[in-house]
UniProtKB/Swiss-Prot annotation:
Name of the gene: Atp10a
Annotated compartments: Cell membrane; Endoplasmic reticulum membrane
Organism annotation: Mus musculus (Mouse)
Record lineage: Eukaryota, Metazoa, Chordata, Craniata, Vertebrata
Sequence ranges on the Cytoplasmic membrane side: 1-79, 130-313, 389-1101, 1155-1184, 1237-1242, 1307-1508
GO biological process terms held by the UniProt record: positive regulation of membrane tubulation
Protein modification: Autophosphorylated at the conserved aspartate of the P-type ATPase signature sequence.
Function: Catalytic component of P4-ATPase flippase complex, which catalyzes the hydrolysis of ATP coupled to the transport of phosphatidylcholine (PC) from the outer to the inner leaflet of the plasma membrane. Initiates inward plasma membrane bending and recruitment of Bin/amphiphysin/Rvs (BAR) domain-containing proteins involved in membrane tubulation and cell trafficking. Facilitates ITGB1/beta1 integrin endocytosis, delaying cell adhesion and cell spreading on extracellular matrix. Has low flippase activity toward glucosylceramide (GlcCer).
Protein name: Phospholipid-transporting ATPase VA
Annotated GO CC locations: endoplasmic reticulum membrane; phospholipid-translocating ATPase complex; plasma membrane
Location of the active site: D431
Length: 1508
């Protein structure tokens, strides 16, 4: 099995300690060969003690070795270290203090040993979990440390096999093809004649494309054959750091020459050697100093908002405990003072015969009460929450709806402690490219020398891809809506659903069969789908390219070949040369297939993510294939018949079997100790020459096509476009690039320098020597916003200058046109350098490369000096298709009350076009565009926009004066009054955003953005993205979520409260930095609206239940103090008191916290506005906490005094009377939990039954066998006696019901008269929808008479009320209207024919504005249902049916409670029948002017009243 490198991400958080480095190591690291004797020693001294490094500082310096150690404990340190870590949690310290306080004789309340049991149990459970995790890490470390590699030995003068853990800095390591790199190694030798090495970094960053690494520049010229014994060079490099994209340093050779070191010279630990027979290098960083392990910091610990609120409530409980204990202490002191003379009759004196003074007795009583009432602080709360969160994550991972079949990936939960935050998100910050779009760049249009080439044929080709997608979805939808008349059973609908999903799955498999088979048999090449590779050239441009080629073929031997071309043709030629060579694309020829064998990935974490934890205990439910993360293909075909599915399945099965055979026969690296020394080198060498070829690769070889592996999809798209015009990139080395042309043949350009792309310059350049002219040319491509500013100034005096201005003006117009069409734009430019200019620039550039400390700054300045006075060649437009389901997902998230901000680096026009396509912007809404050239202009524009917004929404005004804007802003919610206009959207570019994020303007910008419906930030850098998220999070105190797919989104993801990464084509950096990872953007809908809501609701109710339960139990003990002189005595036996919360009542609440579903998933998805309850913290807020505390106090009062009155005149002892009190408390807790439980499963019943059985079983056994264990209690035969007493059963029946009556009454009254959105959703979900026919199925095969296609299309978006039959829908509609319509709006009730069908409306129409101030689009839709005439009824029967709405209220699903709900709702039914039926006068009529979604509900009611 393969193991991923990031599995050791837990290393930093697991407590390992890196070996301490000596402080005098300096600001850089100097490394020399370990084969040389150390300075200051004799030559015979070879090597050094283990763990030591030989450096050029004249002495031995201790550095980290290559041993991987992620464990935290040893056998001796486990117990003290683990306890020390657990005591970092203040709750554990508190309970240990209480347990130790119980050992003081003067204040003890329980037996000391028994009081320690709960806290020891909690500590033991946590310790066992930590021990198991650490042991798993130890086994993983041992396996990795004992992997083998070849290290050069001076004694044997050859490479010998050594363990990874034995590698040291300065050792020479030889690696073969397909071998994992054991440390960070400087590449000194390669079997490739050009000194190249290909590595695969999928284990490190998830990118599947190969990266090129090259031997140190100049080293291969100094030595013809690398020999470690003769290596005397000195390496000076930077100290260890976690920057994967940077390596700075230089190597000084023995002749004094100095060469700069770059990231291209460094082989990183965890990467895999590909397509290279053998390489050798010297170890620079080892062990925990390698960049891979420095980046593996593990999942971040975040504290959820609910947990922060819970900690605050825990402090309130502590304060309440102190107050109760203080009250009891004062009471006991007063009691002792009053009965001082009579105390000797019933109190035990001290050892000297004296009695305690009232003050001393009060102090003792205070501490004793702290011990007795310690259960007020829930000891098991934190452990229970951790258990519930782990189980919640398990069920989220098991959700098949979050599995993406196309990419064979599913949701990953990387943070286990913030699942409830998913249900409280208010702001979503999203990247565009790769997040909202497919990140499949397709060359669409271009302009060269001011002439535009539309590529109409290419547009038609892309249209065929889209048609294929739509045809597939249409066929699937038709198959899914076939109506089977006469099948009314539920099993039939389930069978049809399963069949529909199967057909859809088969269709996907069949339409992508070719791409998937290629992916299964060979490693997937990123950005190389047929849609991306197959470019249809424009005929006019192709003719010009051919003309250039023919002219140059004739004039190539002349002195200036390019001079024979016209300026237009010269630009065309340079344009495609720039597209071909101005990149970092790696070319893989067909005769050089990517070799790959099954090897073990380097690192394995015991619990890297929850998926690893789950795979250890449960088999995977999801079908797993051999497709990579980047295996995305949009090529779809439509099968004409179902029989076409069978061959696809059989072929896939055959290929899967073939792959398994290949995997079994492929060689792998030995990982279990030493292999035999005999023939060891031969086995490594044979492995290096392994050439495994699969049918897919053979097919590619036969086709003779080159494989391009690019770091970005834009580069791949441009290279494929150039190849379509017969300008093919055929080879790339570190110092040359070869291009194939039809008539010219192969042209080899000397590659002098490559200035890579960065987010600040927003461009990249290459410096080459032209083979035809021997000139030094600079080709630059980048964003039009920067390249246009770098062009050579044109003079209007000469004709050439005017012509260039005209070309630039046309090009800019075409760029704007491309952006409006949603295309990504790039400008291509060129500069010719003279030899003097190049020599001057080269000198400064070499100095910048040799710098170690400030290399980035110097290289940036060097690139800026070079990329000036450019000549514009043309521009390109690249299309990036929108992901499937993005518009629908954005619409649902908006209905859920989420505000979506898109932060993209694209051009403003492009971003706006994509925003319209994904429905982020609507064509009918106003868009505020904020573009400023200076900070003063930005401030003025912000003031103007704020004035405009305030004039549109008068209620949304600034409460602070202008002078207070720099200090702070008063953020008021957007007004939702009837006179308020729809909120506009805001678009801002990167330059203006930089000004708006200044301290003086950030409050204005944030206030303006808060008033807008959507925000679109264009040309934003990664730093700006993180600053925007941080600003919203800190200023608005709102829950934020950031989602992205690339490395430029990492900072934004890490700053947000919840970070979501998309496993796209640009690697796994975003996923590795995220809390959750999803395959596609559309899965965010279900993750937030369904699982986020469930997780928040479950944990909120569970935490409240914990506080209620403990407070109620403490209340029983508190009321008893009034009858025992506040002496801190307890009527409940010690065993029950200590283990009640830990054993008897813990399981049911855990089951409810894991499995409860307050609203079904389909209802949450149909009505996303239900999500707002979590945003507003409706289920867990301070008000709910204190109401639960008051309810707990009342229940404890009832549960105490009912058995007290029942046994008032009896002669039972205090512990016999306390046992019924304990049983009553248990029954009350379980019934209370039953009321709060919305979804009952057999596990809920089992948990409640088990708790009851466990309590009575323990009581019976304890009362029989341990009667005198803990004096002074004597519980002998107590429970047996009570079980034979009818009074015991009567009190256990009456007390819980009496205690819960106020809660039952309140919930029934509130659920009937003032229901919340969630309660209405639950009521509607209980309606038996399956017995009525679905209109979509009824009319699937034909259009009903009298209905247009528009009406049928509207039915697809109808709410759940509209899918109900008329009688049920009208009842729910009346119920909603009655709760929201005021007497003024309704007017006088009019006589209504109750046989007239009622008008239908969407769910929660009346209450949609309560939580968020907005409502869904409303409209009355006429619906025809079979059998309507039979279901029309009289007024009496109509009222009777309306009463069924109150038959099962929202507080639970127990049938025996329904009578209370029915009784409380009868009064509302009478009012309902008179006020809500007035709206129905005619059947099938529509409102003339349906209200807009932004309008308030009362405006809609006013229109209805006016219409009636």
């Amino acid at each position: 099995m393969e193991r991923e490198l990031p599995a050791a991400e837990e290393s930093a958080s697991s407590g390992w300690r890196r070996p301490r480095r000596r402080r005098w190591e300096g600001r850089t690291r100097t490394v020399r060969s370990n084969l040389l004797p150390p300075l200051g020693t004799e030559d015979s001294t070879i090597g050094a003690p283990k763990g030591e490094r030989l450096l050029m500082r004249g002495c031995i310096q201790h550095l980290a070795d290559n041993r991987l150690k992620t464990t935290k404990y040893t056998l001796l340190s486990f117990l003290p270290k683990n306890l020390f870590e657990q005591f970092h949690r203040l709750a554990n310290v508190y309970f240990v203090f209480i347990a130790l306080l119980n050992f003081v004789p003067a204040v003890n309340a329980f037996q000391p040993g028994l009081a320690l049991a709960p806290v020891l149990f909690i500590l033991a459970v946590t310790a066992i979990k930590d021990l198991w995790e650490d042991y798993s890490r130890h086994r993983s470390d041992h396996e990795i440390n004992h992997l083998g590699c070849l290290v050069f030995s001076r004694e044997e003068k050859k490479y010998v096999n050594r363990y990874w853990k034995e590698i040291r800095v300065g050792d020479f390591v030889r690696l073969c093809c397909n071998e994992i790199i054991p440390a960070d190694i400087l590449l000194l030798s390669s079997s490739d004649p050009d000194g190249l090495c290909h590595i695969e970094t999928a284990n490190l960053d998830g990118e599947t494309n190969l990266k090129r690494r090259q031997v140190v520049r100049g080293f291969s010229e100094l030595v013809s054959e690398f020999n470690p014994l003769t290596f005397t060079s000195v390496i000076e490099c930077e100290k260890p750091n976690n920057d994967l994209s940077r390596f700075r340093g230089y190597i000084m050779h023995s002749n004094g020459e100095k060469a700069g070191l770059h990231k291209e010279n460094l082989l990183l630990r965890g990467c895999t050697i590909r397509n290279t027979e053998a390489v050798a290098g010297i170890v620079i960083y080892a062990g925990h100093e390698t960049k891979a392990l420095l980046n593996n910091s593990g999942p971040r610990y975040k504290r959820s908002q609910l947990e922060r609120q819970m900690n605050c409530d825990v402090l309130w409980c502590v304060l309440l405990l102190v107050c109760i204990s203080l009250f009891s202490a004062v009471g006991h002191g007063l009691w002792v003072r009053r009965y001082q003379e009579k105390k000797a009759l019933f109190d035990v004196p001290e050892s000297d015969g004296s009695s305690l003074s009232p003050a001393t007795a009060a102090v003792y009583s205070f501490f004793t009460m702290i011990i007795v009432l310690q259960v007020l602080i829930p000891i098991s709360l934190y452990v229970s929450i951790e258990i519930v969160k782990v189980c919640q994550v398990y069920f989220i991972n098991q959700d098949i709806e979050l599995y993406d079949e196309e990419t064979d990936s599913q949701l990953q939960c990387r943070a286990l402690n913030i699942t409830e935050d998913l249900g409280q998100i208010k702001y979503i910050f999203s990247d565009k490219t790769g997040t909202l779009t497919e990140n499949k760049m397709v060359f669409r249009r271009c302009t060269v020398s001011g002439i535009e080439y539309s590529h109409d044929a290419n547009a038609q080709r892309l249209a065929r891809y889209q048609e294929a997608d739509s045809e597939e979805e249409e066929v699937v939808s038709k198959v899914g809506t076939i109506s089977h008349r006469g099948s009314t059973g539920s099993h039939q609908s389930i069978w049809m659903t399963h069949k529909t999903q199967s057909i859809k799955s088969h269709r996907r498999t069949g339409s992508r069969a070719e791409a998937k088979r290629a992916s299964m048999l060979s490693k997937h090449t990123a950005f190389s789908s047929p849609m991306e590779k197959d470019i249809t050239p424009d005929p006019k441009l192709l003719e010009k390219v051919s003309e250039c080629d023919r002219f140059l073929a004739i004039a190539r031997h002349q002195e200036h070949p390019l001079a024979h071309l016209s300026p237009e043709l010269s630009d065309v030629f340079d344009f495609f040369i720039a597209l071909t060579i101005c990149n970092t694309v790696v070319v893989t020829s067909p005769d050089q297939p990517r070799q790959k064998v099954r090897v073990r990935f380097e690192l394995k974490s015991p619990v890297k993510t929850i998926e690893d934890f789950l795979r250890r205990f449960t088999p995977s439910r999801l079908a797993s294939g051999c497709s990579s993360i980047g295996n995305l293909s949009t090529s779809k075909s439509s099968h004409k018949s179902g029989s076409a599915f069978l061959p696809s399945l059989s072929q896939d099965s055959m290929l899967l079997g073939l792959e398994e055979k290949l995997g079994q026969t492929a060689p792998s690296i030995a990982s279990n100790g030493y292999a035999s020394q005999a023939g060891q080198e031969e086995s490594w060498a044979s492995e290096c020459t392994t050439d495994q070829k699969c049918p897919g690769e053979q097919r590619e070889q036969q086709e003779g096509e080159l494989r391009y592996e690019a770091e970005s999809p834009d580069e791949a798209a441009l290279v494929y476009a150039a190849r379509a015009y017969n300008c093919a990139l055929v080879d790339r080395l570190h110092d040359q690039v070869s291009v194939e042309l039809p008539h010219l043949g192969r042209l080899t350009f000397e590659l002098l320098h490559t200035l890579g792309f960065d987010s600040i310059r927003k461009r990249m350049s290459v410096v080459i020597r032209h083979p035809l002219t021997d000139e030094i040319n600079v080709y630059t491509k980048g964003a039009d916003s920067v390249v246009m500013d770098l062009l050579l100034p044109c003079s209007s005096d000469d004709a050439r200058g005017r012509h260039q201005k005209k070309i630039r003006s046309k090009t800019q117009n075409y760029l704007n046109l491309y952006a409006v069409e949603g295309l990504r734009t790039l400008c291509i430019a060129k500069r010719v350098l003279s030899k003097e200019e190049y020599a001057c620039w080269l000198q400064s550039h070499i100095e910048a490369e040799a710098s170690v400390e400030s290399r980035e700054e110097l290289l940036f300045q060097s690139a800026v000096r070079l990329e000036t006075n450019l000549h514009l060649l043309g521009a390109t437009g690249i299309e990036d298709r929108l992901q499937e389901g993005v518009p629908e997902t954005i619409a649902k998230l908006r209905q859920a009350g989420l505000q979506i901000w898109v932060l993209t680096g694209d051009k403003q026009e492009t971003a706006i076009n994509i925003a319209y396509a994904c429905k982020l912007l609507d064509h009918g809404e106003e868009v505020i565009t904020l573009n400023a050239d200076s900070q003063e202009a930005c401030a003025a524009l912000l003031d103007q926009c704020l004035s405009y917004v305030q004039s549109r929404n008068p209620r949304s005004t600034l409460q602070n004066s202008e002078s207070n804007l720099s200090v702070g802003f008063s953020f008021n919610p957007v007004s939702t009054s009837t006179d308020a206009s729809p909120s506009p959207s805001l678009v801002i570019d990167g330059r203006s955003l930089a000004y708006a994020l200044e301290k003086s303007l950030e409050d204005k910008f944030l206030f303006l953005a808060k008033q807008c419906r959507s925000v679109l930030c264009c040309r934003s850098t990664p730093l700006q993205k993180s600053m925007v998220v941080k600003l919203v999070r800190s200023k608005l105190k709102a829950m934020t979520l950031a989602i992205g797919d690339g490395a430029n989104d990492v900072s934004m993801i890490q700053v947000a409260d919840v970070g979501v990464g998309i496993s796209g084509q640009e690697g796994m950096q975003a996923v590795m930095a995220s809390d959750f990872a999803v395959p596609r953007f559309r899965y965010l809908e279900r993750l937030l609206i369904v699982h986020g809501h469930w997780c928040y609701s479950r944990l909120a109710n569970m935490v409240l239940y914990f506080f209620y339960k403990n407070t109620m139990f403490v209340g029983l003990l508190f009321w008893f103090q009034f009858y025992c002189g506040f002496s801190a005595s307890a009527m409940i036996d010690q065993w029950y008191l200590i283990f009640f919360n830990l054993l008897f009542s813990s399981l049911p609440q855990l089951v409810t916290g894991v499995l409860d579903k307050d609203v079904p998933a389909d209802m949450l998805l149909r009505e996303p506005q239900l999500y707002k309850s979590g945003q507003n913290m409706e289920e867990y807020r301070p008000r709910a906490f204190w109401l639960n505390m008051v309810d707990a106090a009342f229940q404890s009062l009832v549960c105490f005094f009912i058995p007290y009155l029942a046994y008032y005149d009896s002669d039972v002892d205090v512990f016999t009377w306390g046992t019924p009190v304990t049983a009553i408390a248990l029954f009350t807790f379980l019934l209370h939990l039953g009321i709060e439980t919305k979804t009952w499963t057999w596990l809920n019943w089992l948990a409640c039954g088990f708790s009851t059985f466990l309590f009575f079983s323990v009581a019976l056994i304890y009362n029989t066998s341990c009667a005198t264990c803990y004096p002074p209690s004597n519980p002998y035969w107590t429970m047996q006696t009570l079980l034979g007493d009818p009074l015991f059963y009567l009190t256990c029946l009456i007390a819980p019901i009496a205690a819960l009556l106020p809660r039952l009454f309140f919930k029934a009254l509130q659920g009937s008269l003032f229901p919340t959105q969630l309660q209405l959703g639950r009521q509607l979900a209980k309606k038996p929808l399956n017995k009525f026919s679905d209109p979509k199925e009824t009319f699937a095969q034909g259009q009903p008479p009298g209905h247009s296609e528009t009406e049928l299309s509207e039915r697809k978006t109808m709410g759940p009320f509209e899918t109900l039959p008329r009688d049920c829908a009208s009842q729910a509609s009346q119920f909603t209207q009655q709760l929201t319509c005021s007497p003024e709006a309704s007017g006088e009730p009019s006589a209504v024919d109750t046989n007239m069908p009622l008008r239908e409306n969407t769910l929660l129409e009346g209450l949609g504005s309560q939580a968020s101030g907005s409502s869904m689009p409303r409209g009355a839709i006429s619906e025809v249902c079979p059998g309507d005439s039979k279901r029309q009824s009289t007024s009496a029967s109509q009222t009777a049916r309306l009463s069924s709405l109150f038959h099962l209220p929202s507080f639970g699903s127990l049938n025996w409670i329904s009578s209370l709900s029915l009784a409380s709702g009868l009064g509302s039914v009478l009012q309902l029948s008179g006020s809500s039926l007035q709206m129905d006068k005619q059947d099938g009529e529509f409102l003339s002017n349906p209200p807009q979604p932004e309008q308030d509900l009362h405006s809609f009611q006013g229109q209805v009243t006016g219409y009636l």
